[in-house]
């Protein structure tokens, strides 16, 4: 079925390219359909795009127009989000379910059309309704218009998409988590959809991802984390990396033997095949919090780097394995991210030195009473449901309308309010270890309600946000993703943020530009940005369970003074919720 489907609807790629570097049009058709896949002795029905797992790579050049036709042949509604694409004045195409649009119904089609402006590097795309992004995802590569990189040009670039293999139906997984059940786990990590040969069932060894290389040549690995639950450590035995980019922006080259990538992040690394020709294992290992956090299985996938000219049994030699950190050691992730800085180049943007609005966001966890009850037995009883919060508010996601439509039409009543708190309701010691186990100290800080509270900004406002992890989260880090923007990551630190002490750590010279900010376990991150892109922009943690639990909000950015600084009306291909 898949083969005939792809023959008739095959990915239509129209690249009207560029003589003399002119922008073109890149056009694809994404057919979303069911497919049976067998792993670990069991056959699972999954949802994919064009018969591929991961899905097709969208490969464009800076300045191109992208047109994607999505055909929904699965029994569930879905949207496609272009993760990290700035969507300048094209918020209608962002693809955030119930934020910018209602889902594409089963049997229907939708076209996304947008420009790619002032971005170069690796982004990605994924489904943005329920848990479908586990298998509906792929790389989104933006190449420089002049074909020149600020680092040695690789002979080849290779997406390395790290994910998870779930046997549980993903729509059922979403339902279970919304009901407060967080006991389900994937069976394995994956590299480019392969579980790897460390996984087996009844003697049947799973297939590994294989990267074929030639000695002396360099390769650009585009490492993307699509997983629900974990950061990942990624290494190749006998090789080092030079980190050159992240989230569609260049970085100051940084040498390391290991990459750490959080859910939502995309990290670009150069790898030179300079080891003695042989086979070398690559490992993706999930980094998971230590006790007393709930302990989950070890997720790992093993792939292979294979040099040309080496026979299938590695000339009779053992295949080297990389030495990995302890899976519960979170500090390598902190140090990796802290060592990254933005690359100074002619087009780099400068940090706003003046701040118009300062926001302090505490990332927390707690319980509320189930149903419409206002009182209930606490201490994680069956009368409560666990929620995640930002400044003590757990976000209620709409499920019948889209926030962008309501904002554009001027009809927010009964759907959202614009009173998202810009600071926590009560200060406390946010990283007090005594708050980790549930108990009376934690209970007085817990939220009491869910709501759809948004924050509105005037156009061209300079905003500073301090994200603070709390021990109410136990030991989770938090990859916070802001749609529609790149933000300057000024600093990260451990412990509770202290302005007098920590502002001196801010990097105003060459900070990273990121769309996904990893707020470290028991620590904080400081960002700044200018609200120069009007629309409705979703802000959320990229751990799937935190999204479902309510660690989210949306920013409304008003129109500027001119048509060129304003959100245009919905394009002809946009389908309103009542017409979906």
UniProtKB/Swiss-Prot annotation:
Its main location: secreted. This is Laccase-20. Coiled coil: none annotated. Binds 4 Cu cations per monomer. Its cofactor is Cu cation. It comes from Oryza sativa subsp. japonica. PROSITE patterns: MULTICOPPER_OXIDASE1 (PS00079), MULTICOPPER_OXIDASE2 (PS00080). It is an enzyme of class 1 (oxidoreductase). It comes from the Eukaryota. Residues 1-23 form the signal peptide. Residues 31-147, 156-310, 419-561 form the Plastocyanin-like domain. GO terms for biological process: lignin catabolic process. Cu cation 3 binds at residues 128, 483, 540. Glycans are attached at residues 36, 42, 115, 200, 339, 373, 392, 399, 429, 460. It holds the Pfam family Cu-oxidase.
